[in-house]
Amino acid sequence: MNIHTYHHLLFPSLVFHQSSDVPNALSLHIHTYEYIIVVIDPFRITLAFR
């Protein structure tokens, strides 16, 4: 499973960038925010439990 599919499964309610009525800037921001959560949080959690 690639990271794109993975973050869509984790944050289905935040996936707005496929909707045509959402401005591109907003959809890009939401998509980027999701990606940052998925990429950064696992590292932060891992460090916290070391």
Swiss-Prot record:
Keywords: Activator, Transcription, Transcription regulation
One BP annotation, GO: positive regulation of miRNA transcription
Role: Regulatory peptide encoded by the primary transcript (pri-miR319a) of the microRNA miR319a that enhances the accumulation of its corresponding mature miRNA. Acts probably as a transcriptional activator of its corresponding pri-miRNA.
This protein's name: Peptide encoded by miPEP319a
Gene: miPEP319a
